[in-house]
């Protein structure tokens, strides 16, 4: 882990929290849009949410677990309310008008609450697993293990809370199938695309940090 000033950590906390919030909001909207791939039911949210695990793993690797946990706790409450508002306004992918906020939508509220619980569970587990394995000489070990464990807890918790006995008949009937397929796609996408992306971004960020450290050292000298 590198040494950072308090100002750098505050900036990282702000921008990474904003990134997490944007991914959560978009995923909560996209999870309302089911798709079928090779006969298996899943949602578009399977393709957006892995970005959070990529960001969290890079945060733990570069800034350390404490900052990653601060981001999780900073994002949880805002994500709950903003996700409900956005998902109500764009219910089932269609603009409902601002009057949609004047009445309570149980379907959307369950999605927002499920996202709140699943995000906290999945991210805390992701940070814990990654932090335990981050010193392993195999660079891919920590992100792979944290992705597998974090995603399974996040996905199953989310779909159970959001769609078990849901008023949406399709999701109520297929939530378990969709959850398992969603998890499989998340893992596949993460291992095929996000794991290599993690390696590339990690090397790029570490190189930039090393270059900045050298410049700072020269200026100090």
Predicted features along the sequence, with ranges:
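Alpha-helical transmembrane segments and their lipid-water interface positions
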Residues: 31, 82-86, 126-130, 155-162, ...
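Hydrophobic transmembrane alpha-helices
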Residues: 1-73, 80
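Juxtamembrane helix-boundary/capping and inter-helix hinge elements in multi-pass membrane proteins
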Residues: 61, 65-67, 134-140, 166-171
């Amino acid at each position: 882990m590198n040494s950072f000033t308090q100002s750098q950590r505050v900036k990282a906390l702000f921008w990474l929290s904003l990134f997490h919030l944007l991914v959560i909001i978009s995923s909560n909207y996209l999870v309302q849009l089911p798709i079928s791939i090779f006969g298996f039911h899943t949602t578009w949210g399977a393709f957006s949410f892995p970005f959070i695990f990529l960001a969290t793993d890079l945060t733990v690797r570069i800034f350390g677990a404490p900052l990653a946990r601060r981001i999780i706790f900073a994002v949880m409450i805002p994500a709950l309310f903003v996700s409900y508002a956005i998902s109500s306004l764009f219910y089932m992918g269609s603009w409902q008008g601002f009057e949609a906020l004047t009445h309570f939508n149980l379907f959307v509220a369950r999605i927002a609450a499920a996202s709140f619980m699943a995000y906290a569970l999945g991210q805390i587990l992701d940070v814990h697993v990654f932090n335990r394995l981050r010193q392993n000489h195999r660079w891919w070990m920590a992100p792979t293990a944290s992705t597998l464990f974090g995603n399974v807890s996040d996905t199953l918790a989310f779909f159970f809370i959001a769609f078990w006995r849901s008023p949406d008949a399709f999701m109520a009937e297929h939530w378990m199938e969709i959850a398992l397929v969603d998890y499989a796609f998340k893992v596949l996408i993460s291992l095929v695309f996000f794991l290599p992306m993690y390696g590339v971004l990690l090397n790029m960020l570490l190189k930039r940090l090393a270059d900045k450290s050298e410049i700072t050292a020269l200026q100090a000298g």
